[in-house]
Amino acid sequence: MAMQPGADATQSGAGDPIDEPEALRRLQLDDDPSAQYYAAWWLGRQRSQHPQTVILLRKALQQRRPRQLGDDVEENAVARNAARALGKLGPIAAPAIPDLLETLNDDDHGLREAAARSLGQLNAKAAVPLLVARLASGPAVAGAREEGTPRLKEPCDALLEALGDIGVVEDQVLQVVHLFLDHERPVVRSSACRALLQLTGESQWGERMVALLHHDQLQVRRAALMDLGATGWYPALDAISNTLAENSLKLIALRGLAEQADNPAPDEAVLDAMDALL
C-alpha cells in the first residue's frame, strides 16, 4: 500500500517541522524516495509558487523506480506525486505541460492517470487530442479490464474528467465521451456524465449522476458526489445533502455548488445545507 502523508501538511512522518525550503531540499534527495514522495505532495498541497518548485517537480516527474520490498511507496511514487502536485500549482506550472503530455504515453497506468488529472486542472487544451486518442477505442478496448488486475486498460475516469475540465467542445470530444455512457462500471459512467454536463450544460447528465447517488455501492455514491461537486450543478443540492455517504464528502460536493462560477455569492440554501452537516 502506498505511503500516504497525514492530514497535517506541516509535519513529516518523523514529527519534525517542514516548510517550503525543506520540502524543496527533500525533493532533491534522489537516494531517499520516501522523502521525495512527501516533499512532492507537500509542495502540491501548499500550492507552492517558489521559482524552483516547478523545475524540481519536472525533474521528479522523469524519475522511474519500481516498488521494492521494504519500500513505503508505490511504483514510480515520486513521479506520480510530482504529476499530481503540478496540477495544483496553477499558471506557474504551464512549463510542465509538455512533460505531462509526454507522461500520458507512459507505460505506468497510475502515472497516466495522475498526468491526465493534472492536465485537466491546468486547463491544458493541448492535451485534448491525446486524451481523445487514449479513449477512442471505447469500452471494448480502453475501457476493458486489464488481465490479471481489477483496473481498466486506460484510466478512463481520469481521461474523461480531464476532457470535461478542459472544456473544449468539439465533435470528436463529445463523440468519444458518449462512448462511455453505458460502460459496465458506474464510476466511469459518472465521469462521462460529468464531462458532458461540463461541456454541454444539458441537465440530463446531471440527472444521471443524481441517480447514481442512490447506487447500492458506497464507492459509486462517493464518485457521483465528487463529480456533481466538480460541475457545481445546483439542482443536485437536495440529493447531495441526503446521500448515504460521509458528511465530509457531502461538504466537499456542496462547496463545489457554492463556488460555481455563475453564482459569485454563495446561495443561502447551499450554506444552510452545509451548516446542517457540521
Segments predicted by a language model, with ranges:
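Short inter-helical turns and helix N-cap capping residues of alpha-solenoid HEAT/ARM repeat scaffolds
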Residues: D31-D32, R64-R65, E74-E75, D107-D108, ...
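Conserved hydrophobic register position within alpha-solenoid helical repeats
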Residues: A39, A82, A115, C156-L159, ...
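Non-membrane alpha-helical segments in proteins
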Residues: S34-R45, K59, N76-A85, A114-R117
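N-terminal "cap/leader" segments of large eukaryotic alpha-helical scaffolds
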Residues: M1-W41
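Residue-level detector of extended alpha-helical repeat arrays and alpha-solenoid scaffolds
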Residues: Q36, E75, A79, R112, ...
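Amphipathic alpha-helical scaffolding segments comprising HEAT/armadillo-like alpha-solenoid repeats
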Residues: A14-L27, S48-L69, P91-N105, A124-E146, ...
